[in-house]
Amino acid sequence: MKLEVFVPRAAHGDKQGSDLEGAGGSDAPSPLSAAGDDSLGSDGDCAANSPAAGGGARDTQGDGEQSAGGGPGAEEAIPAAAAAAVVAEGAEAGAAGPGAGGAGSGEGARSKPYTRRPKPPYSYIALIAMAIRDSAGGRLTLAEINEYLMGKFPFFRGSYTGWRNSVRHNLSLNDCFVKVLRDPSRPWGKDNYWMLNPNSEYTFADGVFRRRRKRLSHRAPVPAPGLRPEEAPGLPAAPPPAPAAPASPRMRSPARQEERASPAGKFSSSFAIDSILRKPFRSRRLRDTAPGTTLQWGAAPCPPLPAFPALLPAAPCRALLPLCAYGAGEPARLGAREAEVPPTAPPLLLAPLPAAAPAKPLRGPAAGGAHLYCPLRLPAALQAASVRRPGPHLPYPVETLLA
């Protein structure tokens, strides 16, 4: 490896002094000359670059010749060797520096260990309630609550101060604490009092301070299948199977019996998916035509109707209303239903078709088939309104509204 050391050139004013010193001290041994050619070598392994004495660059023949001659080269080589030694010492110090620094920091960390005191085994709600209950007046400010906690528990005396925010948040976010204003004109002040809410005593039941009401763990007893809910006494959690009840005159539907046989945890209602899928699907038209689903005309006795005046004159086409709109059905079914009406049934509010206005099938606006229209006994006001032009309160004809 070739090591080259660069030193600054000597000033021109110091040149003569160095020459004189070199000339006068030529008899003194030089550290380079003492080493000899064997230490540095003559092949230029460690050549000292020094400025020339005559103001220009002068090549040297060898380190041994310069030291033996006692010229200025020997004097300038001494600072170069010293600079090389300083550089080597700095490198050694830099190599040993990180390890020494780490050891020093480790010693400092070991000398001051971090110890955190144990936290008390209570929630912040319990600690605040404890402080308020131990007070003389039953109310404390935020600063007084903090002082109480610091005086009673060592955990709150350490360097950790985040517990103060927890105390403040628990005071303002829980319903079990109530703020009592010291000055009503300053509700935003921090010196207000805090006390326990008398309506939230359930949170402090059994000596345990809870955030919410404790849920009831026991469940209501399930009534036996043969007993009604109001007749079932208090039974254990798993009641034994009761004997089958005698058949009652009012028979229960099979759907209701299946619901009772289903487990108690299963949702049983008419809107449940099981009960919806259990019922067979029937279209609306089939439900309307099924026997027993529609009320036949004259099936039930009706009170006698009051006598009506004579038949009104034939109404125009606007007063004709479709019988299908009132549940009369299509004309084909009307004759079959009239045959079923007993002779004692009261007459309908339908006027017989006069000869001047025979029944004619008209095509309704909604249905595509033909409907049977006949004049009804409408009040005089409604007939008058249907005869004249539609006013501001009746913008459309009657058959358009009722069709």
UniProtKB/Swiss-Prot annotation:
Residues 119-214 bind DNA. Its main location: nucleus. Pfam families: Forkhead (PF00250). SUPFAM superfamilies: Winged helix' DNA-binding domain (SSF46785). Residues 236-246 have a biased composition (Pro residues). Residues 96-107 have a biased composition (Gly residues). Residues 32-48 have a biased composition (Low complexity). Expressed predominantly in the stomach, trachea, bladder and salivary gland. Residues 1-75, 94-116, 216-266 are annotated as: Disordered. GO terms for molecular function: DNA-binding transcription factor activity, RNA polymerase II-specific; DNA-binding transcription repressor activity, RNA polymerase II-specific; RNA polymerase II cis-regulatory region sequence-specific DNA binding; sequence-specific double-stranded DNA binding. Plays a role in hair follicle differentiation. This is Forkhead box protein Q1. It comes from Homo sapiens (Human). The lineage of its organism: Eukaryota, Metazoa, Chordata, Craniata, Vertebrata. The gene is FOXQ1.
